[in-house]
Each structure stands twice: as C-alpha cells, then as structure tokens.
Amino acid sequence: MFDIGFGELLLVMVIGLVVLGPERLPVAVKTVAGWIRALRSLAANVQNELVQELKLQELQESLKKVQEEAGLQNLSPELKASMDELKEAAESLKKAYQNEPDAGSMKASEINEVAQKPAASQVVASSGPSALVDDQAASATKKKTSD
C-alpha cells in the first residue's frame, strides 16, 4: 500500500522508539492502527453506498426503458401489476437509501473516539496481554451496542 520495505519500517520504528520512548511507543502504534482501521472502514462504507446507488439508478433506467418500448396501453393486467411492483420496489429502495443516517459522520466520531482514548490504552498496554484482549473485547461489545 505505501511501498515501505522492511528496512524502512525498521528505521521508522527505531526513530519512534528514540522519540517516544519504550512506554509510549505501543500506545502510539495502537492509536495509529485504530485510525487506519477507521479510515479503511469509512472507505468501504463509501464504496458500498456508491455501488448501491448505481444499482438503484440502473434499475430505474431499465424500468423507464421498458415503459418506453412496450407502452403501458398494450400490456396485460398481470404485466401492469408486475411493473407496479417494480416501481414500488425502486421507490422503497430510494426512500430507504435517503433515510439512512450519514455513515461518514459516524465513522468520523469513531476516529475521534480512538484519538481520545490513548490514556486508557496506555494502562492496558502496561497491564499485559490478557488485559489487552479484555480491552479489545470490551470495545467490540461497545461498538456493537452503539450500532
């Protein structure tokens, strides 16, 4: 992704160790990893929303094309009913998409939450690996309940 080799990564870690010290370096690495994770999930959400919008637009275009080609006067009642169902499905998808809360603002708040959490992470880092696992499980539970 960033085209960073092992030597360059090792150099960055040594400089980070000298600048931050052995106590704050794990906290800084964890904070940066949280930011990267939040940004990746934000990008995935934006991509999913674009795909959903394109599918909705394609459905509406195909519906208009069918209406223009066939003409509603020549259709049987069964076909008219199926066309109405397609229209309702397209409208419900459009309404559902418009009623969703902005996923970008939610992810920005998660980024801020991770940025303001380094003090709690420092305590976890000094407590050992079992405390780190407990902290990760608690934060995962917290995220699930907030969704």
From Swiss-Prot:
GO terms for molecular function: protein transmembrane transporter activity. The Tat system comprises two distinct complexes: a TatABC complex, containing multiple copies of TatA, TatB and TatC subunits, and a separate TatA complex, containing only TatA subunits. Substrates initially bind to the TatABC complex, which probably triggers association of the separate TatA complex to form the active translocon. GO terms for cellular component: TAT protein transport complex. This is Sec-independent protein translocase protein TatB. It is a single-pass membrane protein. Its main location: membrane. It is found in: Cell inner membrane. The chain crosses the membrane at residues 1-21. Keywords: Cell inner membrane, Cell membrane, Membrane, Protein transport, Translocation, Transmembrane, Transmembrane helix, Transport. The lineage of its organism: Bacteria, Pseudomonadati, Pseudomonadota, Gammaproteobacteria, Enterobacterales. Residues 96-147 are annotated as: Disordered. Belongs to the TatB family. The keyword Membrane applies. Part of the twin-arginine translocation (Tat) system that transports large folded proteins containing a characteristic twin-arginine motif in their signal peptide across membranes. Together with TatC, TatB is part of a receptor directly interacting with Tat signal peptides. TatB may form an oligomeric binding site that transiently accommodates folded Tat precursor proteins before their translocation. GO terms for biological process: protein transport by the Tat complex. NCBIfam families: tatB.
